[in-house]
């Protein structure tokens, strides 16, 4: 980030998966004291209820567009881009309501607390020989399993047999539950995973 700033290079953060509270802060980039010039967000902005995405620009970029427009450059020529998930009243209304609920119910603070709780619980089983590493932030955690066959063909179906829908990306079992997950549900997830791994 420092090198980009020094050389006047715009920084872009892809926060489609990590933004809107998923990592325990509003934007994941906040965890790293990183202030991007452009931010792409989606998914959680509507809590998954409606396909919505947005591209956010800092004031410096907007000011430069305004200056170009004052010099006779039409806005449509300055800012040419497309996005298939923007411009709907329904999406905007849902997103505003989601942001209101996140703030009203302190859900991002809860994600941070639940994420720490989940990480502590998962770290208790990390010594299992089938686990290479557990990493993540907030409620975006990856459990790196010793091999992808075990992750996809054994752990994933077994977890589903216990009522837990999981996704394996290669060797990594993803733990990215609803922000409303309870500590009891986290315990059930970890205990079920541990039992499957120790069979």
Task: For the regions a language model picked out, list residue spans one by one.
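Conserved N-terminal phosphate-binding loop of PLP-dependent enzymes in the Aspartate aminotransferase
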Residues: 1-199
